[in-house]
Amino acid sequence: MSIFPIILALLLIGLDEGEALDGYPLSKNNYCKIYCPDEKVCKWSCKHRAGATNGKGDCINKGCYCYDVAPGTEMYPGRLPCNPY
């Protein structure tokens, strides 16, 4: 039995992972991963960040959740986490 199909499958699974245009982590299973300690801003960001909505302002995945980051951490050039502007 060859291990090639197993390795190929693992590589293809890895290709599903990536980053949204705003620099936040993005995965096929949860388009609403957000680094933010503030729940209100987290929900706002979930609706407004690139790749997180269905075009109507609704999250593709309702299981939106937040991660804390160190103060001042830049997730994308010129943008701080939890900055809605």
Swiss-Prot record:
<feature type="disulfide bond">
    <location>
        <begin position="42"/>
        <end position="64"/>
    </location>
</feature>
<dbReference type="GO" id="GO:0090729">
    <property type="term" value="F:toxin activity"/>
</dbReference>
<keyword id="KW-0732">Signal</keyword>
<dbReference type="GO" id="GO:0005576">
    <property type="term" value="C:extracellular region"/>
</dbReference>
<dbReference type="InterPro" id="IPR044062">
    <property type="entry name" value="LCN-type_CS_alpha_beta_dom"/>
</dbReference>
<protein>
    <recommendedName>
        <fullName>Toxin To6</fullName>
    </recommendedName>
</protein>
<keyword id="KW-0964">Secreted</keyword>
<keyword id="KW-0738">Voltage-gated sodium channel impairing toxin</keyword>
<feature type="domain" description="LCN-type CS-alpha/beta">
    <location>
        <begin position="21"/>
        <end position="83"/>
    </location>
</feature>
<dbReference type="GO" id="GO:0008200">
    <property type="term" value="F:ion channel inhibitor activity"/>
</dbReference>
<comment type="function">
    <text>Beta toxins bind voltage-independently at site-4 of sodium channels (Nav) and shift the voltage of activation toward more negative potentials thereby affecting sodium channel activation and promoting spontaneous and repetitive firing.</text>
</comment>
<feature type="signal peptide">
    <location>
        <begin position="1"/>
        <end position="20"/>
    </location>
</feature>
<feature type="disulfide bond">
    <location>
        <begin position="36"/>
        <end position="59"/>
    </location>
</feature>
<dbReference type="InterPro" id="IPR036574">
    <property type="entry name" value="Scorpion_toxin-like_sf"/>
</dbReference>
<feature type="disulfide bond">
    <location>
        <begin position="32"/>
        <end position="82"/>
    </location>
</feature>
<keyword id="KW-0528">Neurotoxin</keyword>
<comment type="similarity">
    <text>Belongs to the long (4 C-C) scorpion toxin superfamily. Sodium channel inhibitor family. Beta subfamily.</text>
</comment>
<feature type="disulfide bond">
    <location>
        <begin position="46"/>
        <end position="66"/>
    </location>
</feature>
<keyword id="KW-0872">Ion channel impairing toxin</keyword>
<keyword id="KW-1015">Disulfide bond</keyword>
<dbReference type="GO" id="GO:0017080">
    <property type="term" value="F:sodium channel regulator activity"/>
</dbReference>
<keyword id="KW-0800">Toxin</keyword>
